[in-house]
Amino acid sequence: MAKETFYITTPIYYPSGNLHIGHAYSTVAGDVIARYKRMQGYDVRYLTGTDEHGQKIQEKAQKAGKTEIEYLDEMIAGIKQLWAKLEISNDDFIRTTEERHKHVVEQVFERLLKQGDIYLGEYEGWYSVPDETYYTESQLVDPQYENGKIIGGKSPDSGHEVELVKEESYFFNISKYTDRLLEFYDQNPDFIQPPSRKNEMINNFIKPGLADLAVSRTSFNWGVHVPSNPKHVVYVWIDALVNYISALGYLSDDESLFNKYWPADIHLMAKEIVRFHSIIWPILLMALDLPLPKKVFAHGWILMKDGKMSKSKGNVVDPNILIDRYGLDATRYYLMRELPFGSDGVFTPEAFVERTNFDLANDLGNLVNRTISMVNKYFDGELPAYQGPLHELDEEMEAMALETVKSYTESMESLQFSVALSTVWKFISRTNKYIDETTPWVLAKDDSQKDMLGNVMAHLVENIRYAAVLLRPFLTHAPKEIFEQLNINNPQFMEFSSLEQYGVLTESIMVTGQPKPIFPRLDSEAEIAYIKESMQPPATEEEKEEIPSKPQIDIKDFDKVEIKAATIINAEHVKKSDKLLKIQVDLDSEQRQIVSGIAKFYTPDDIIGKKVAVVTNLKPAKLMGQKSEGMILSAEKDGVLTLVSLPSAIPNGAVIK
């Protein structure tokens, strides 16, 4: 029997700068849902990706002296590295520059044009380049006037300056779908979540009247061009939103994924783009005569004490820093526990450290440590088999375990992650109290209480197993470590279905000889200071410390170094090393193997096909037993390493001078 499918998407991110913890928040939330649904037995499809067209990308690439795709490839490599670091379990990563996407955008646009939903006209409006959005005069923030006429203002979404733009444009006649959209809302009251977002869409956008939407631009050319009128570039409303179906092969030669997974079960996004997903996207699907997604969920923002994150304010949180110093589980746990999903939440270093110390190190970590230590002390490491409840406290714990699963499930289904985790921690806290109430150290002194003592240990381990299973969608390492230390190696006992009946450990097991701390306790004062320091804005030009220069060399010394262009044709990880990649490069006249310490910044797939600069006259060396015949040039700044990429037009073997 085929599994029931579940299709979840994040927004596709705009790669015009480094991602911060707010982007990680959306993607981790999607990952939690995907992992939870897989545990429930669903056939899950989890999609994320990048929105790579538009004026801002074109300008960023030009400023960097690169082609758009060269600029994008570098940015996307960083995004994929962050997702890998967060252990995001996405099944696909869609880039809007891919042919599979471009093909769908072209066909969708021409179809809507042919059936009269799109028409050619002229547009004049206030435009924000960073937001890629037009605004009416009434929507502008801090409008500027001259002789009673608006001459400028700021975007209501980002606060960026807007400019008056007038150009020929294709328009999407969305106004004719207004009644049909409202009828859909009535028939599907849970379509937009939380409910407050639905009221906002109806009262602020639909009731005042939907204006037809400009869906093409002529003022830039980086994007998908309209096939029948190539001077027009398809605008973001169609280009970006269509990714959810282009990634499934819609209108391709193989629509099997589309037929299997569409409509989406959940579109997940931050609240500032819910309008596009709850109004424009449903209308676009109606025009294409396609089923609408089942739910659009708009979560809140991660705020700082002084408002939204901003590099200039010095309050941007880099998830890489948190993961590197405190581990992935602590970072994922904080995001899903501290911040109520659907509402805005405030990030503070103090709360991050407190959650790590109190919840993870004290409550969970100490429970595991105490339990394993007692099994070793009282039973030489052999956990007695579960016998059933021998005491009313046992009965209470068993009932609470089953009730915890029920409450947890209800919270997870409504995407109330912080509530689900709170439910688990109440159970963990109650289990810690169970130790104090049953007093194993007293029972151990009375041989007649041996069975009772063994059953207390069995209940403790079973409770820990329940908690570990429920935490699997959130924490990617701790549950595995718990199962290993308890020597629970039956995969069935790690699945959600094993929680339907309490007491599956009906045979004795040998726990680990010495428990290992899963979450080391942090020095609160030092770590709070560290996080605050990491959030400081970059130094101004006047404040930047001068990087010490190396001794000057003569041109003859530099001429000794031979640097050539090469293409990376293959790459793989070096065994037993988390830093090294073994790379094959094509220098035209020969192929060489180079071992490079870039594995923390690039995967093999990220670099295959890249044109790079290679120092070719270094003496061969051996690294981890692998021969290395050269060095690939890279740049390093603030601990982040980036390969020096060359334009593809430079032939392999060309000497760089």
UniProtKB/Swiss-Prot annotation:
Domain spans labelled tRNA-binding: 557-657
Keyword Aminoacyl-tRNA synthetase recorded: yes
GO molecular function ontology, one term from the record: methionine-tRNA ligase activity
Main localization category: cytoplasm
CC per GO annotation: cytoplasm
UniProt cross-references to InterPro entries, sorted A to Z: aa-tRNA-synth_I_CS, Anticodon_Met, M/V/L/I-tRNA-synth_anticd-bd, Met-tRNA-synth_bsu_C, Met-tRNA_synth, Met-tRNA_synth_2, Methionyl/Leucyl_tRNA_Synth, MetRS_core
UniProt-annotated binding residues for ATP: 311
EC class name: ligase
Positions of short motif 'KMSKS' region: 308-312
UniProt-listed Pfam families: Anticodon_1, tRNA-synt_1g, tRNA_bind
Record-given protein name: Methionine--tRNA ligase
Organism in which the protein naturally occurs: Staphylococcus aureus (strain MSSA476)
